[in-house]
């Protein structure tokens, strides 16, 4: 019988060394790295400078506390110490004034109490440990939260002017500081609500998560805006954002063509909830794909063009755009959640949808339909570009809803509409101007951008490049946005030459 050589039908047998748990002597690994080096000299003069700032807080804020025993204070760190690894957690601890949040780069907020400020001054004066000295060297200023800071640099007059009109005033959005679990948070919220009631400022927190401490506040005049800006509990006050559909660049119509209807016997199909302006009921073929409707817009304010266009793409995308690659040809139904009223004067009466109203409508529908439908399309947004430092309130609330109801929101990256439109690659100036708009910064949402399906030789994107109107990331904390891109129409950067994708409206085919 011939002997098999190595590599001719049998594998080489290699020795195995078995290491059992706890086998052998454990050796302590010596720590590495050098002692923390301070960013500046922390001498007596510098310590006294910080002590004076804390004393100013004690004298200006603490005596004015009514009904509460704590106040937020702003801490600015130097630019070199903006990284989280330099965060002064030991200096601002539970024993002194704990950190309760952060804002822009190098901006922290701490909870100040009379006892905590006294402890903080003692630490600043006398503590010589390497850790404390390093953290003291990070501090630029310790200061009060000002009304201007709460208004994000806007004047009270400008804020009132930008706020949408309500029943008896103008609707603003107010966020409170979050002191964390305990009596202090309940106390500042109760004191805030009490003072607003005394001044006749109507509050409404419906639509916002309870622990977000967010309110719609209706202000009748500049004096009430100013009063809110001075309340200790308030972290920010802004105009209430308006929600709009992401309106297509062109809607040239053509006569209807025959499109496939849904087989009545085929009930086992995926369904997308279209959260939009409504889906037309006048086309029998499209109506066959609509599995249900929840219409929350009054008849005089209905304009279903945008919602119908979106639904047509979901149901018949490959049929109306046969030359576009990568389109799913399987059947898909839609559920019509009509929440966005008409905002085009050429189409009839107009009204606005507030951010708070959208959130209320969404949660109401989710309570009923979330177990059945898991993908919800939101081709809507605001005109507010996302910050690189913090997430938009709308994105935070949408993430809360997605987590609570275990659904996924598909969200538009937003459209840039001011000519000249965006180049690719983006110019340095366009990186800020063309950033995604809220709520495209949703972490759990799937943010979608548009690619060009045509090739512009000049003054426009090349094929497969981002469309000139499609906004880009990054989002807050440099998260990657958009999450997904697909063909969504194209145009030249001067807005003259348009090449859309095809779908339908009530009037017929549209591009």
What are the roles of these predicted feature ranges?
Residues 261-293, 297-354, 406, 419, ...:
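Subtilisin-like serine protease catalytic core
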Residues 1-63, 88-170, 174-183, 190-263:
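Autoinhibitory propeptides
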Residues 377-379, 409-414, 448-449:
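Active-site neighborhood of phospho(di)ester-bond hydrolases with catalytic His/Asp-centered motifs
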Residues 71-84, 175-187:
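Short, surface-exposed ligand-recognition loops at beta-strand->loop->(often short) alpha-helix junctions
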Residues 253-254, 287-292, 350-353, 359, ...:
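Short secondary-structure boundary/capping segments
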Residues 278, 284, 430-511:
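Extracellular S/T/G-rich loop segment that most often corresponds to the catalytic His/Ser-adjacent loop
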């Amino acid at each position: 019988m011939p002997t098999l050589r190595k590599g001719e039908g049998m594998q080489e047998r290699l020795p195995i060394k078995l290491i059992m748990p706890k086998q052998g002597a454990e050796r302590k690994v010596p720590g590495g790295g050098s002692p923390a080096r301070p960013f500046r000299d922390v001498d007596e003069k510098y310590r006294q400078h910080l002590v004076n700032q804390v004393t100013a807080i004690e004298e200006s804020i603490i005596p004015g506390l009514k009904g509460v025993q704590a106040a937020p204070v702003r801490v600015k760190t130097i630019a070199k110490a903006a990284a989280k690894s330099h965060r002064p957690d030991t200096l601002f601890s539970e024993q002194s004034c704990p950190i309760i949040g952060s804002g822009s780069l190098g901006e922290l907020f701490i909870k100040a109490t009379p006892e905590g400020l006294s402890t903080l001054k003692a630490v600043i004066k006398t503590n010589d440990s390497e850790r404390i000295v390093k953290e003291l060297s990070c501090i630029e200023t310790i200061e009060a939260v000002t009304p201007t800071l709460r208004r994000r640099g806007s004047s009270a007059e400008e804020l009132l002017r930008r706020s949408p009109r309500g029943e008896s005033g103008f609707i603003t959005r107010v966020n409170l500081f979050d002191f964390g679990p305990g009596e202090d948070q309940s106390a500042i919220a109760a004191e805030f609500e009490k003072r607003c009631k005394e001044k006749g400022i109507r509050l409404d927190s419906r639509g916002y998560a309870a622990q977000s401490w967010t309110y719609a506040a209706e202000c009748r005049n500049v004096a009430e805006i100013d009063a809110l800006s001075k309340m200790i509990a308030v972290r920010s006050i802004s105009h209430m954002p308006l929600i709009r559909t992401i309106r297509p660049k062109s809607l040239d119509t053509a006569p209807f063509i025959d499109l496939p209807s849904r087989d009545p016997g085929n009930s086992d199909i995926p369904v997308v909830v279209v959260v939009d302006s409504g889906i037309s009921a006048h086309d029998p073929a499209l109506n066959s794909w609509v599995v249900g409707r929840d219409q929350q817009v009054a008849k005089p304010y209905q304009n279903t063009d945008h919602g119908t266009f979106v639904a047509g793409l979901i149901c018949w995308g490959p049929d109306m755009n046969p030359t576009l690659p990568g389109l799913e040809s399987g059947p898909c139904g839609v559920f019509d959640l009509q929440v966005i009223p008409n905002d085009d004067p050429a189409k009839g009466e107009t009204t606005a949808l507030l951010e708070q109203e959208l959130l209320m409508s969404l949660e109401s529908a989710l309570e009923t339909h979330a177990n059945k439908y898991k993908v919800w399309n939101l081709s809507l947004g605001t005109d507010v570009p996302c910050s690189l430092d913090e997430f938009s309130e709308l994105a935070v609330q949408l993430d809360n809803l997605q987590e609570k109801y275990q659904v996924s929101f598909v969200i538009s990256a937003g459209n840039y509409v001011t000519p000249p439109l965006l180049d690719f690659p983006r110019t340095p100036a366009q990186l800020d101007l063309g950033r995604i708009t809220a709520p495209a910064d949703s972490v759990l949402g799937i943010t979608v951008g548009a690619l060009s399906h045509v090739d512009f030789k000049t003054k426009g994107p090349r094929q497969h490049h981002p469309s000139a109107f499609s906004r880009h990331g990054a989002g807050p904390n440099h998260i990657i946005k958009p999450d997904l891109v697909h063909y969504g129409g194209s145009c030249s950067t001067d807005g003259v030459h348009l090449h859309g994708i095809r779908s339908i409206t009530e009037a017929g085919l549209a591009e």
